[in-house]
């Protein structure tokens, strides 16, 4: 049997929103989450369907690759901490070396990006609009506490589908705020409300952050 359990990979990911969460947490600031714990419908998207992302394209992971987009880096500081929601996205940036190659440990071949289309855990079907498109992804280990970015093999950005059905190209240079910021909410991430901490990119990922931004 293959490392992906015989399942077909996927090159699309669903928007989980601008908050670093494990796959089994109930919360979501985006348009998708755990189906058995969370109900999101068009009426609940107060930011507007033309200003909120649903899906992004995503690179499928490549076995033994250390390249950003094709692999997920392992961050040892996440392993040492049990509540990663208070970790900044900049942790992933610190793991990238020359030529967009990860410098340390990477996830094993069974936990590659997009490796299983019917699996609702972070590496496979979610992205978090906290680092800009084509930024690095990192996590604790295996499928736990993985911060996945939107990614593509297009130069300069990614295509996203917004809730009104339009497809937009988003540049890697989009305003993504300050990656060193955190919600500061380690025990109650559901209390994270209001405008995104991660600029226009994060605002496009939040479904009810009350931001007045449009897709660039």
Question: How does the language model describe each region?
Answer:
Residues 1-19:
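Surface-exposed loop and adjacent secondary-structure segments within mature catalytic domains
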Residues 16-216:
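Hydrophobic alpha-helical interface faces used for helix-helix packing
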């Amino acid at each position: 049997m293959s490392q992906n359990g015989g399942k077909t990979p996927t090159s699309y990911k669903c928007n989980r929103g601008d908050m670093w969460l494990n796959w089994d947490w109930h919360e979501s600031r985006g348009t998708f989450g755990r189906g058995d714990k969370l109900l999101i419908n068009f009426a609940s998207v107060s930011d507007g369907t033309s200003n909120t992302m649903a899906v992004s394209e995503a690179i499928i992971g490549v076995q033994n690759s250390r390249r950003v987009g094709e692999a997920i880096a392992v961050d040892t500081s996440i392993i040492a901490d049990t509540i990663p929601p208070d970790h900044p996205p900049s942790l992933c940036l610190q793991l990238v070396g020359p030529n967009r190659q990860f410098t340390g440990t990477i996830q094993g071949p069974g936990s590659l990006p997009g490796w299983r289309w019917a699996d609702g855990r972070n590496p496979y079907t979610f992205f978090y609009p906290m680092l800009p498109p084509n930024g690095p992804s990192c996590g604790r280990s295996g499928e736990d506490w993985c911060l996945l970015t939107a990614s593509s093999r297009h130069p300069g950005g990614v295509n996203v589908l917004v809730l009104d059905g339009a497809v937009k190209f988003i540049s890697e240079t989009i305003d993504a705020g300050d990656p060193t910021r955190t919600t500061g909410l380690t025990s109650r991430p559901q209390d994270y409300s209001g405008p995104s901490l991660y600029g226009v990119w994060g605002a496009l990922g939040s479904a009810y952050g009350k931001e007045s931004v449009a897709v660039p």
